[in-house]
Amino acid sequence: PFDIVIASEDARFSDPVVAFGVNGVEYFAHPWEVGVRKAKEMLFTGEAITAQEAKNLGMVNHVVPLSDLTNFTMKMATHIAKQPLLALKLAKQSVNQMQDGQGIWTSLQAAMSLQHMGHAHERLLHQTAVEPEGEEKIKKQAKKGASNEFE
């Protein structure tokens, strides 16, 4: 997971990795970022969500107009860079340790094991690490955007 996420208003977020026939390491992060039910919906459907929905879910900190994205991001980065370095490091480490205490590291290890199993399965079936039709499915989904129209 990222420390701070700033998105433009026109950004869309999706995770169509299931179309590849395997899981990715991102599987472990979604429940932490957006909750279990939304994580399952995003992974099972591959449907995109808007930047505002991502913000409402806690996946994004700020949503700004595309024309303001660089300026907003640089202002925030400059503000953070002016903070006492040791205090920033301690704050980040504290939050990261809290996540570790809640099981994020264990989740990552489990996701990696499942990812290896998925790739091995696809190699046995298709002699490739991913579902052969997956790329086309993902391209089709990307063209559709955040319409939430299921086929």
Predicted stretch roles:
Residues 1-88:
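Crotonase-fold acyl-CoA enzyme core
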Residues 49-51, 71, 78, 82-151:
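C-terminal alpha-helix plus adjacent terminal tail
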